[in-house]
Amino acid sequence: MEMDVTRDTVEVLPQHKFDIRSLEAYLNQHLPGFGSDHRAVLTVTQYRSGQSNPTFFLQKGSQAYVLRKKPPGSLLPKAHKIDREFKVQKALFSVGFPVPKPLLYCSNASIIGTEFYVMEHVQGRIFRDFSIPGVSPAERAAIYVSLVETLAWLHSLDIHSLGLDRYGTGVGYCKRQVSTWTKQYQASAHQSIPAMDQLSTWLMRNLPDSDNEECLVHGDFKLDNIVFHPKECRVIAVLDWELSTFGHPLSDLAHLSLFYFWPRTLPMINRGSHIQENTGIPLMEELISIYCRRRGIDPNLPNWNFFMALSFFKLAGIAQGVYSRYLMGNNSSEDSFLTANTVQPLAETGLQLSRRTLSTVPPQADAKSRLFAQSRRGQEVLTRVKQFMKQHVFPAEKEVAEYYAQNGNSAEKWEHPLVIEKLKEMAKAEGLWNLFLPAVSGLSQVDYALIAEETGKCFFAPDVFNCQAPDTGNMEVLHLYGSEQQKQQWLEPLLRGDITSVFCMTEPNVSSSDATNMECSIQRDGGSYIVHGKKWWSSGAGNPKCKIAVVLGRTESPSVSRHKVHSMILVPMDTPGVELIRPLSVFGYMDNVHGGHWEVHFNHVRVPASNLILGEGRGFEISQGRLGPGRIHHCMRSVGLAERILQIMCDRAVQREAFGKKLYEHEVVAHWIAKSRIAIEEIRLLTLKAAHSIDTLGSAAARKEIAMIKVAAPKAVCKIADRAIQVHGGAGVSQDYPLANMYAIIRTLRLADGPDEVHLSAIAKMELQDQARQLKARM
């Protein structure tokens, strides 16, 4: 749901009222910009959520802020440390982690009765109901993927570089948690609950051996503490850092997983039905797999039952504390009295989990598909894509071919025929859109590999699902490295399919197989950058919807390495100085359906400095991140193309006769068919292995697998296409059959994203390094 302040807030509760005029006077003096509108009056309302530290929405004119303060009255020791919240948010904001911008901390209790801090108000979506009603299953899955990826990001931060000295002890975290929450519970208990005592004893006796692991943990990481982008399934702010410290990361992951084991006798924390009744929510094992993949750790987590039991124990302790404050009259929420009845069921659930062995590895399907198993959602989407292709895409091939044949000499040849645009709207309506991007689709690379194979069977199918190159790579760049302004201006319309883009890297006057040869310059000039140089093989530049170019160039700096002199910048195609010189043919084919491949000149093009992506000298780094998944996407589609070619070959071999027998009865043709099937199975497995490596280890660690399939797939498919052409004779190279065009496409892939020879050299280097490490280990 869109965050609605009027619905999320109430009049300040009587026990939390404070002197608003005193606060306003203080903020006028200490918060820059707060008093700029002298006619505006400060209004204060209180958020319904926030059971611990009272949270308030401040509005003054067009300015909006959020204030967090300590609750009044007698408090439990070491609780409600507002200064710690401010400190950790300030540190996280400085490294780009999504938190509201912290603005001011006040330790002077005389201003509003307690210490407090103020942060920016973040406008977005907060989902109070874990089942996330009102969105499609695809969006629901993507929201949960983004949620767990953000948690993995938090746990991957280097705590020593955050400047949070003495923020937490870290080592021995689990033992301290059990001890702390036992004491907190005992200090606030209003009745005896045997399950709490038994669970406390079990936890203390079963502490994990890995209690020395430490990172920054949130302490209360769950769906309704997250602000999502208004339109995208992307986390833009993590809230409520009261319980954060240095500790064991699995405590956060277990807390996020509470709803998977929620007792049916108890209403859900965030309303909603139970997990089994919601389509699109990943299985717990799938969520854990995504988390572990992002952190590069083994998904088979030891002591998972301990962390789940600890989470229920901790939540029961929190519930008891909330009820205790209600009894004392300083509760932060209207419905605090309801928590009294939750303590015992939570404790009993934790006790039950302590006696179970919990698996964190996704369940496997049948033995045949066990090697690279798709997720439940991946299987569902693949089935729907296959059905969509069969019912809508393949039947449209003839109409699309006729359009480009009729418009080959007109400007309309660069546009999509109406049938493709209709198919795109249909695919979007069915949720089969942007499937390549895990944060949007909720799919893994293995999931997408098999989907991309299906779309590779038709020239224009990737466009139908908004999964076409080079837009997929450019959207990946903006998603991973773009600023909020860049995402809003360019990523959002790309994700909607309103515009397309072009990637400008290869140059006509240098050997582009060595990317460091680049001549195109990107030079700073005040508040702008000047882009000057020539690019070619800029795919998609001729599409009338192409509105933005992602340009790689040199920002010269003699004091750094040759891989630190490249930068990447966004250049709107209508900027003065951007010139489309000519389209380039591929074996005579113009590739109209994808907007062609163009030579583009940038003649002293001036763009704002804010168009630079990530920073100066980061271009090569971004390129490697972009090309990793992008390279295997090409290979995934090529497997589908190979299947289509083999189908055409077999049809011909069955229909035609030579020398008194069918073509397939000639041993040489039969062997070609057999060798083609073997080759397809080989490259499919290697493609899936590369996808699996990206899923589990990340793009950097999967470099060798990516390079291997980038060499193997196009080469194998070229051979299959050559055999099919040979089976067709002269017809195979004519316009009557698609084989010549297919061969042109796949032959080009042996050059695109780096030629075979560059990848072979890289593979050899990595193999020698691996062998050297193994030899050293044996010695």
From Swiss-Prot:
Binding site for FAD: 503-513, 537-539, 656, 726-730, 755-757
Residues modified as N6-succinyllysine: K368, K390
E.C. number: 1.3.8.-
Pathway: Lipid metabolism; fatty acid beta-oxidation
CDD domains: ACAD10_11_N-like, ACAD_FadE2
GO biological process: fatty acid beta-oxidation using acyl-CoA dehydrogenase
N6-acetyllysine modification, residue list: K175, K765
Annotated GO CC locations: cytoplasm; mitochondrial membrane; mitochondrion; nucleus; peroxisome
Pfam families on file: Acyl-CoA_dh_1, Acyl-CoA_dh_M, Acyl-CoA_dh_N, APH
Swiss-Prot/TrEMBL catalytic activity: a 2,3-saturated acyl-CoA + oxidized [electron-transfer flavoprotein] + H(+) = a (2E)-enoyl-CoA + reduced [electron-transfer flavoprotein]; docosanoyl-CoA + oxidized [electron-transfer flavoprotein] + H(+) = (2E)-docosenoyl-CoA + reduced [electron-transfer flavoprotein]; tetracosanoyl-CoA + oxidized [electron-transfer flavoprotein] + H(+) = (2E)-tetracosenoyl-CoA + reduced [electron-transfer flavoprotein]; eicosanoyl-CoA + oxidized [electron-transfer flavoprotein] + H(+) = (2E)-eicosenoyl-CoA + reduced [electron-transfer flavoprotein]
Residue positions, PTM Phosphoserine: S210
Residues the record lists as binding substrate: S513, G628, P629, G630, R631, G754
Major site of localization recorded for this protein: other
Keywords: Acetylation, FAD, Fatty acid metabolism, Flavoprotein, Lipid metabolism, Membrane, Mitochondrion, Oxidoreductase, Peroxisome, Phosphoprotein
Modified residue annotations for Phosphotyrosine: Y323
Cofactor(s) annotated in UniProt: FAD
Alphabetized GO MF terms: acyl-CoA dehydrogenase activity; flavin adenine dinucleotide binding; long-chain fatty acyl-CoA dehydrogenase activity; medium-chain fatty acyl-CoA dehydrogenase activity; very-long-chain fatty acyl-CoA dehydrogenase activity
Function: Acyl-CoA dehydrogenase, that exhibits maximal activity towards saturated C22-CoA. Probably participates in beta-oxydation and energy production but could also play a role in the metabolism of specific fatty acids to control fatty acids composition of cellular lipids in brain.
Family of the protein in this entry: Belongs to the acyl-CoA dehydrogenase family.
Name of the protein: Acyl-CoA dehydrogenase family member 11
Species of the source: Rattus norvegicus (Rat)
Source organism phylogeny: Eukaryota, Metazoa, Chordata, Craniata, Vertebrata
